[in-house]
């Protein structure tokens, strides 16, 4: 079919794929992070689960949601989910996880362009232990860098309790200097 032919283009069309990857990867990565870490992980946490249990469960669901895969590819995706979830807790937001996911996808899909087109990335169902180890090392480096930057910038990882209480107690006839 014409649709499947699009995915079989040769590396001579690399620039077309590169543009498509640059335009779509950030949206796709952000959507996955919002779903798995922003929604699913927070739902688990709000049900009383320990936040680290929520990280593990959301990482498991994230890895399983990526379809058929061998043990090493599953471990690769599960580890990425663990690190992205840890970034949410350690940095106080989804931004670092989204950035890490975007970088991962840009490298993975960008590399696949030079190996034969998008069909290489779309059809990935297995990887060897060495490739998984290489990926996990890269994930860890990105996660540590993001965490270090958030610490260096003194990013608040949670809302101060007094601000939360002020917002909860705020009424329409409160003073104009209310922080909410």
Where are these regions (language model features)?
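Membrane-interfacial helix-loop-helix connectors in multipass membrane proteins
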Residues: 5-12, 119-121, 125
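Conserved small/polar residues in nucleotide/adenosyl-binding loops
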Residues: 2-10, 170-175
